[in-house]
């Protein structure tokens, strides 16, 4: 996994679920892989994205009928169809080659908009290139999972200021009045747990001391992969929530 491994592991959910078309609920559309929602995509866009990810044309063609279907219509589509699946390698490719560029650009745009409207509370001249790997991973995950940083003003401001004590107060995500227990727990362990974060910083320093510099983003992703390899995803993942749901809100 090249980038944003925390988000990837969270989005694939229960083992095998993401490899078949499924309906996450709410206002989402038919979804496959790590959050590829076809509810607001055109047939041509779906076909191009899926084949670019290495999915065979026959499977991609079978999925283009899910275009523009959301809510109950998407749920019915999933219930009426079977025998469509992709491989683990294909869903990784879909994430890395299609979804990461798409949501990274959304994150960059939303940060610029947020900074413009909160100039008095964020660092001067802050932009995507000035952020640490930790900041990028967090903000990318919130855009990918919830759709909007604007729904989390206290958290976004705290992340941009690297005020981790305040982030620890506001990081929890809720949906329909229920906390996303597993995602919140893993988020804290990876990005906020003082002991774990300190361990990562020490490992980075050791690598530099041995003249083996590792890019911060790459090191962070490697450590997240190791964290998930020690965990049982199938028994602990939260139910996937539609990205554009109005039910997302910040813990205050």
Language model features with spans:
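Residue-level recognition of short, well-ordered coil/turn positions
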Residues: 147, 163-164, 195, 231-232, ...
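Acidic, aromatic-lined catalytic clefts of primarily extracellular/periplasmic carbohydrate-active enzymes
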Residues: 1-136, 166-213
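Extracellular cell-wall/glycan-interacting regions and their flexible linkers
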Residues: 1, 198-252
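Catalytic and substrate-binding regions of cell-wall glycan-acting enzymes that process beta-1,4-linked
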Residues: 135-179
């Amino acid at each position: 996994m090249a980038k944003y491994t925390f988000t990837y592991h969270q989005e694939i959910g229960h083992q095998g679920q993401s490899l078949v078309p499924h309906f996450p609920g709410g206002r989402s559309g038919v979804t496959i892989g790590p959050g590829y929602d076809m509810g607001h995509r055109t047939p041509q866009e779906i076909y191009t994205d899926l084949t670019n990810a290495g999915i065979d044309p026959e499977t991609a063609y079978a999925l283009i009928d899910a275009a523009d279907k959301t809510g109950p219509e998407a749920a019915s589509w999933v219930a009426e169809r079977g025998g469509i699946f992709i491989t683990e390698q294909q869903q990784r490719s879909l994430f890395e080659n299609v979804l990461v560029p798409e949501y990274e650009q959304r994150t960059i745009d939303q940060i610029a908009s947020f900074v413009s409207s909160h100039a008095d509370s964020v660092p001067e001249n802050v932009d995507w290139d000035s952020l640490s790997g930790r900041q990028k991973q967090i903000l990318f995950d919130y855009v990918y999972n919830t759709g909007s940083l604007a729904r989390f003003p206290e958290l976004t401001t705290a992340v941009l200021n690297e005020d981790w004590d305040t982030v620890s107060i506001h990081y929890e995500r809720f949906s329909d009045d229920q906390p996303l227990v597993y995602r919140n727990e893993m988020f804290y362990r990876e990005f906020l747990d003082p002991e774990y974060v300190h361990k990562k910083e020490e490992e980075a320093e050791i690598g530099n001391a041995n003249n083996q510099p590792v890019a911060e983003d790459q090191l962070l992703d490697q450590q997240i992969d190791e964290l998930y390899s020690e965990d049982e995803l199938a028994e602990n993942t939260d139910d996937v929530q539609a990205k554009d749901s109005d039910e997302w809100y910040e813990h205050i």
